[in-house]
Amino acid sequence: MQINRREFLRISGAGAMTLFLSGCGLSALLGSEENKAAGTIPEKGSISGGKAMKIVVITSSPHPKNESTSYYLADRFTEGAKSAGHEVFTFDAANSDTHPCRGCDSCHMDGPCVFKDDIEQTLMPKMLEADMLVLVTPLYYYGMSAQLKTIVDRFYSRTSKLNHKKSVLMATAYNSADWTMEALVAHYNTLVRYMDWQDAGQVLAIGCGSRSLVESSAFG
């Protein structure tokens, strides 16, 4: 079914979602647990377990915020989550002081990392206390952006401490072929399995090559 921006905001606040955007038109198969009143904290049985969550949203587009398609979706998700009573922290991986993991193993997978950058000092404490992690990326060569991959690789320093969280994948792509997101979703699903996360949903926007296309779509 087609749903509009208000529905997206409501769903993002209410819990699990499986959304697929084609040509910036939104199609979704939604269970009854997602059909909660707008602006309410999810009822018991939804993805939140009936309580307000701490959510970390990690954006990773190198484009300016006002031009980024993926950032637009992240903003809409954040708006819906906050309106439902959840606490949201957003980290901009593309415009922060970050360093890729160098494989030194000084952390022994239990921290701290040798890099005292924004990942270690700002993002990691928020992720450790979060109930849900939201990974937001433009699709680059059929995978996540290098900026997001840098964050994911740095999970190594706290692997076990980041286990057992809920997660969401949000991605935008110019290509509109039905196989466009297959490689990214496969990577994400593998990450979910390895980290023992609970997948709370995916927003996969194909055929959305510009900010204006997204803004003039069901989300506008």
Indicate where each model-derived feature is located:
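N-terminal secretory signal peptides and thylakoid transit peptides that target proteins
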Residues: 1-16
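Short histidine/acidic/glycine/proline-rich micro-motifs that form metal-
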Residues: 62-65, 140-142, 174-178, 209-210
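Short, hinge-like loop/turn segments at secondary-structure boundaries
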Residues: 105-109, 186, 218-219
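Charged helix-capping and loop-helix junction motifs
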Residues: 149-156, 182-187, 217
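Short, glycine-/small-residue-rich phosphate/pyrophosphate-handling segment
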Residues: 163-201
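Glycine-rich phosphate/pyrophosphate-binding loop and the adjoining helix
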Residues: 189-220
